[in-house]
Amino acid sequence: MMRAIEISAPGAPDVLHLAERPVPVPGPGQVVLKVAYAGVNRPDALQRAGLYNPPAGASDLPGLEASGTIAACGAGVLGLQQGQQVCALLPGGGYAEYAVTQAAHCLPVPNGFDLKQAACLPETFFTVWSNVFQRGGLKAGERFLLHGGSSGIGTTAIQLARAFGARVFTTAGSDAKCRACLDLGAERAVNYRETDFVPIMQGEGGADIILDMVGGEYIARNLDALADDGRLV
C-alpha cells in the first residue's frame, strides 16, 4: 500500500485527505514512478472543486506532473530503467507516493536540475516545446505572438521563446499582468481588454507564429494578425 492525497468531496483545500491506496502496477509501455515531488496546476484546483474530471481510465487522484525515481517498468519499455531519475507528465495520480504513466511521457532530469525543480517542467514545458518549437517550428528572429501571457503556459512560452532568440508579443487581461509578461522578456504586452492586438501585429509585419489557447472569435483575428506564411498553433 502507499499513501496518497485524495479528494473526499468537491470543495475548498480542506477536502484533501491522506489515504491509503494500492501501489499501481505498470502496463505495457508504462512505468511506475516513486514520487519525490508533484507539481500543482490549475486543473488540480479545478478537480478539487469538482470542475474537472480526469480522463477515462486515469487515476482519480490529482497531480498531472511529478518527478522521482522509476520503481518499475512494464513490458516493452525501452530507454528507461529502474532507479533512473525522471520527471513525467501524468494523466492523474501525482499526489501519491507512487504514480503510473506512459514511458513516452517521461524525461530524464536535465543536468543542473534537482528533483524539486524538475517536477515543474512537464505540464508547461512539454506543452510549449511540442507545440511552439516542434509543431510550430519557431526560429530565432521570428515574431511570436501568444495569448494568455500570464498563464502557466504563457509565462513558460515567453521565457523559452526569448531564450531561443524570438521576438515575443503577448496579450494579457490587465496592466499588472502585462507588466509581468514584460519582466519575463516579452517585447510588447497588450491589455486585450483595452487594445486590439491585430493592428499592433500588422504594424510589426504580422506574427510568424501564434500560440492560441483561446479559440472561438480569436481564430479569425489571429488569421488577420499573421504574416504571410505564418503559422497558427
Language-model segments: residues:
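Phosphate-coordination loops involved in phosphoryl transfer and adenosine-cofactor binding
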Residues: 1, 83, 140-142, 207
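Glycine-rich beta-strand-centered segment in the early N-terminal region that forms part
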Residues: 22-40, 51-93
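Glycine-rich cofactor phosphate-binding loops and adjacent beta1-alpha1 units
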Residues: 169, 184, 188-233
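NAD(P)H dinucleotide-binding glycine-rich loop of Rossmann-like/cofactor-binding domains
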Residues: 46, 85-148
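Mid-domain Rossmann-like dinucleotide-binding core that forms the NAD(H)/NADP(H) cofactor-binding site
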Residues: 81, 119-194, 223
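Cytochrome P450 core scaffold surrounding the K-helix E-X-X-R motif
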Residues: 43-49
